[in-house]
Amino acid sequence: MSSLPPAIFLMGPTAAGKTDLAMALADALPCELISVDSALIYRGMDIGTAKPSRELLARYPHRLIDIRDPAESYSAAEFRADALAAMAEATARGRIPLLVGGTMLYYKALLEGLADMPGADPEVRAAIEAEALAEGWEALHRQLAEVDPESAARIHPNDPQRLMRALEVYRLGGVSMSDLRRRQSAEKADFDASGRNQLPYTVAQLAIAPEQRQVLHARIAQRFRQMLEQGFIAEVEALHARSDLHAGLPSIRAVGYRQVWDYLDGKLSYAEMTERGIIATRQLAKRQFTWLRSWSHLHWMDSLAGDNLPRALKYLKTVSILA
C-alpha cells in the first residue's frame, strides 16, 4: 500500500448522478466531500447550479460550496490552493478527501499544476467570435479591461487575435494572462523536472455517466425544465436586480444563467430561453466528455446501474485506497 494518503476523485458530465454517488460513498466511508464545481462556489445561485439542498448539505457537508459572491471571480489557481488545504485538513483528521464535480480544469489544476498557459479551445474562441459579431471588439476590449487591465493596456481594440487570446486564457482558467505570467516565475521552484506538480496523494479516479448519450440528453432537458418549475427565473431575477452584476461575469456566464439573463433582458422568448439553456447544458456535457476521454486511469460506471456503490468500493480496494 502506498505511503501517500488516499484521495478519491469522482468525475462525470453534468446530470450524471455524481452527487448521489458521492453521498452514498460518504455513508460507507470516512470521507470528507470537496466540491469541484466552478458554479457551486457562488452564493445565491442554487437552483440553476443543481446545488444540493440545505438539508442535504447539513447531512453531507461539502467544502468549497458558497465561498464566493457572484460579483467575484474565482480562478483555477485559487481552487487548487483551497482544495489542497481542504484535502490536507481532511487527511489530518484521518478522513479520505472525496472530490466530486464536473469542472475538469480544476481536476487538471490539482493533478498537474498551472504553470503553462492553457491551449487554444475552439469552442471558447467560437463563443468570443460570436460575441464580437454581436457586440463589437471594443465591447470585448472593455470586458478584458475589467479582468486583465494590464493586457488591455497592451492590446489595441483593433487587434482581435491578441484580444481573443487574452480573453480565452481568462475564460479557460479564470485567471488573467498577466497573473499567469507572474505566477510562472514565482512558482517555478515548486515544479519538478517534468514541469508538473506532483499531487501528494494516492488518487483513485472514478467517472460516472449514462452509457447512452441520448439518456444523458433526456436527463439534461428534464432537469432544466424542473429548475424552471422550481423558481430558476426568480433566482436569476434577484441577481439581475443587482447593479454590480452583468452578463460578462463568470457567474452570470454559467450555463443556464446566461440564457435566463438574456430572457430577462428581452433578448429571448421563454421558449427560446428554454431551448438554448438545454442546448448549452448539452454542450457543457460534450466538453466534459471531451476532457474525460483524454483522461487516464479512470474507472467508469454507468449512471443507470443499480450497483455503483459496491462496484466503486470494490475498485477502491483493488487500487489500495481501502484496506
From Swiss-Prot:
Its lineage reads:
Bacteria, Pseudomonadati, Pseudomonadota, Gammaproteobacteria, Pseudomonadales
Q: Which PANTHER family match?
A: TRNA DIMETHYLALLYLTRANSFERASE
User: Which reaction(s) does its UniProt entry say it catalyses?
Assistant: adenosine(37) in tRNA + dimethylallyl diphosphate = N(6)-dimethylallyladenosine(37) in tRNA + diphosphate
Q: Which GO terms describe its molecular function?
A: ATP binding; tRNA dimethylallyltransferase activity
Annotated residues that bind substrate are located at 14-19
A Pfam cross-reference name: IPPT
List every stretch annotated Interaction with substrate tRNA. Answer: 37-40, 161-165
Q: Which family does it belong to?
A: Belongs to the IPP transferase family.
Q: Which cofactor does it need?
A: Mg(2+)
Q: Tell me the gene name.
A: miaA
Task: State what this protein does.
Answer: Catalyzes the transfer of a dimethylallyl group onto the adenine at position 37 in tRNAs that read codons beginning with uridine, leading to the formation of N6-(dimethylallyl)adenosine (i(6)A).
Would you tell me the protein name for this molecule?
A: tRNA dimethylallyltransferase
Domain of life here? Bacteria
- Write out the residues that bind ATP: 12-19
